[in-house]
């Protein structure tokens, strides 16, 4: 079996939450309704298996906002394929976590 066959419902919800654009952890929790104890371990697993990739925003952006730098997550090509399969398996996923419009891509390089 391939990577996408092992998606849990929570992982599928997380993939759906970040499908439209880069998201950081709190955004993912807000969109998905899942707690941090579910989201962050799942994001680590999804990144380890190549379904998502992460990037840190530029330090200057965070400094101007007077907060720590955010780590943003985005689906990989394999992650998009896994989400497509998950949408077939979990038919209500689109209703539970509607796709949000693509937002402006954050500045993710450190500088």
What function would you assign to each model-found segment?
Residues 49-66, 74:
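Beta-hairpin "wing" of winged helix-turn-helix
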Residues 1, 73:
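A positively charged, amphipathic N-terminal helix/segment that binds anionic biomolecules
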Residues 78-111:
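Amphipathic alpha-helical dimerization/coiled-coil segments
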Residues 2-40, 44:
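N-terminal helix-turn-helix DNA-binding core of bacterial DNA-binding proteins
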Residues 6, 65-69:
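A generic structural micro-feature
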Residues 8, 75-76:
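Residue-level signal for threonine
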